[in-house]
A protein has these predicted regions:
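Short, contiguous alpha-helical
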Residues: 1-7, 40-84, 122-159
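Extreme N-terminal tail/first-helix region
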Residues: 1-22
Length: 159
């Protein structure tokens, strides 16, 4: 665990979640790459985020960007300056540099926000009431869930 990183955070809980999000997103990539190499097929669905492995990775990156822009918006902070995610057609070629950019931009905005502000409740972009801390927790879990999903699909295809 990176115990010496981001020491300037006022709220250690936010610091922990920002660092955990980085670990989770970085951890998704090698699993996605193994799934791609194994030619894993996603379950059939009408959801365009599951049209292909590239679409799924694009979705995970778009969501990661969206969580931080939403947090900054609700906190009245400046836009975090995260570039738009690469399209599904380019995501495989650009994912590594994009993740580094995304995570570098994730590290900055929340450092001076005090703990009490993370407890405020807002409507998420999908209509659920969430605290800001809850959104950070959701951001950590999202890539972990997709990693788990891909690992299960690979395991099932080997059986």
């Amino acid at each position: 665990m990176p115990i010496h990183e981001l020491q300037n955070y006022r709220y250690r809980g936010a610091r922990a979640l920002v660092l955990l999000h980085g670990q989770a997103l970085r951890g998704l990539l090698p699993v996605w790459q193994r799934a791609k190499a194994a030619q894993v097929r996603l379950p059939s669905t009408q959801d365009p985020n599951y049209a292909s492995l590239e679409s799924l990775l694009h979705h995970a990156l778009r969501a990661a960007r969206g969580y931080m822009t939403w947090l900054c918006e609700k906190l009245g902070l400046p836009d975090p300056g995260i570039d738009p995610e690469p399209e599904a057609s380019r995501v495989e070629q650009e994912v590594e540099s994009y993740i580094e950019h995304l995570l570098a931009r994730w590290r900055l905005p929340l450092a001076d926000v005090e703990e009490t502000r993370f407890q405020t409740i807002h409507k998420s972009r999908w209509g659920e009431d969430m605290s800001l801390e809850g959104m950070l927790e959701h951001a950590v879990m999202h890539p972990l869930r997709h990693r788990f999903q891909l690992e299960e699909l690979m395991e099932a295809s080997e059986a």
